[in-house]
């Protein structure tokens, strides 16, 4: 269906204005799930979905946790453990770090490889690199530099093993560090994802 002008989706604490010119059946299904099952059943958007939650107008209600964005029933606000990362949105630092350390167990095996099997599926290890870089920047922004450096090196190790250091710009940037003469805030990383994996419209 054509998206009506100034239309708003409202349900369970969420008020979203879709940016899509047309609402396809799949788009309507997502709204139906939010209306009928959320928040009793959680809703997550995979990183592979790119900017889809933004297209649905849900950007104020999603929080990045590792490789997914979790939908909340209230607007997400920045805080001590929730920081805004340009191009990514608000990131849950502690949950993302726990996932990186204990759930994303593929980091070591990926870093030990010598290239990837084919270009068509190289997005799989790329997801680890992007998630690691995002987490490293988030950790650095709150002064957790040793943890940031560790995650950054792990992400870079995966990119190196996949022979994609230049794709992610690791040959041009250094790990985040504290601002001289300032507080513990770190300079933002300059690493950008490859165009095919850009997750926020207008920034690629």
Regions found by a protein language model. Name each.
Residues 200-203:
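Short, intrinsically disordered C-terminal tails of secreted or membrane-associated proteins
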Residues 1-178, 184, 189-191, 198:
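ER/secretory pathway lumenal C-terminal domains and tails of membrane proteins involved
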